[in-house]
């Protein structure tokens, strides 16, 4: 029996009910889960920064429209909005990433917008305007680098959030298709009470890996915040 043939000392050689090596699936599934989490965080940051920088600098009707759209997305609980969009678009890896980007750009937009609102009154920005530089050059070449510190921290936190969301959706069978190994899909077997009670190696190691990885990502975010925020430095 592939489920009971090995002892505790051979945890890393354990297999699931179909004979697939659990350790290998955790490693390969980690690549997919990290790709989803980090890719979604970076792309949602690109969208949020692009819109937030321009809207925060220019103001006017562009800022009003972008702000209202972001408020619409942020007014719904994210998990409910994700479930609704998954039911409409269907299950696939890239559909899930697109949904994460669509529901996650608002927070980055508001952060970038707030930084631009504070920076656009700085003297160096007034000087750049007097030189006749274009809006694009002022926003994205000169102002954006001064706003990157909180943005980098937010990207790390978004990565952890998207990985946890993917794991939760895949555990419920609503995330990435089950034929693609992800940490959430590996956890999916724990829906069976028999597996949950008797075959801990099929879900326990991946649960620990998810927890440790998310904790490490959050530590990286805390370190970036402490190193870039002068108020956190002694």
Model-identified regions with their sequence ranges:
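Single conserved hydrophobic/aromatic residue that forms the stacking wall/gate
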Residues: 1-12
């Amino acid at each position: 029996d592939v489920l009971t043939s090995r002892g505790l000392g051979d945890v890393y050689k354990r297999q699931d009910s179909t004979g697939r090596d659990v350790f290998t699936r955790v490693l390969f599934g980690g690549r997919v889960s990290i790709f989803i989490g980090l890719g979604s965080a970076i792309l949602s940051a690109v969208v949020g920064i692009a819109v937030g920088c321009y809207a925060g600098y220019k103001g006017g009707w562009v800022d009003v429209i972008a702000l209202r759209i972001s408020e619409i997305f942020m007014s719904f609980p994210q998990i409910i909005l994700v479930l609704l969009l998954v039911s409409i678009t269907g299950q696939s890896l890239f559909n899930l990433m697109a949904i994460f980007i669509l529901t996650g750009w608002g927070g980055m937009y508001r952060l970038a917008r707030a930084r631009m609102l504070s920076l656009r009154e700085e003297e160096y920005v007034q000087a750049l305007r007097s030189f006749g530089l274009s809006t694009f050059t002022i926003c994205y070449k000169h102002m954006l680098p001064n706003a990157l510190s909180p943005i980098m921290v937010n990207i790390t936190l978004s990565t952890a959030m998207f990985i946890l969301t993917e794991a939760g959706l895949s555990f419920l069978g609503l995330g990435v298709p089950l034929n693609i190994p992800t940490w959430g899909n590996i956890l999916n077997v724990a829906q069976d009470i028999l597996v949950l009670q008797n075959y801990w190696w099929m879900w326990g190691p991946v649960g620990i890996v998810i927890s440790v990885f998310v904790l490490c990502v959050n530590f990286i975010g805390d370190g970036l915040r402490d190193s870039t925020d002068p108020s956190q430095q002694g």
